[in-house]
Amino acid sequence: MTTEPSGDDFQLFRGQTGLRNRFAILMLRKDGITIRLRANPRTLIDPQKWITEKTYKWYFNDGNGEEKEIKITEKEQIDYAVELLKQSYGLAK
């Protein structure tokens, strides 16, 4: 995994940096951490329904998965967020 700062955000890549290798963006905010994930809504396992229904088209516009968002506001949410990040990592090439 490779990380790269981008303004106030951190981009996470599987291997080398590049659009197709990017699998998540961490956005640090006053009220918590917002994470944009590369996701396949047909195979994503999200029993707690954290993933927003809205699809974004800012960071992941290469046709490999959709851009979805989760928010972390409590320490206790980190373990579940990591499970969602692992699924997103698997979609990056």
Please provide the spans of the model-predicted regions.
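Well-ordered alpha/beta subsegment
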Residues: 57-93
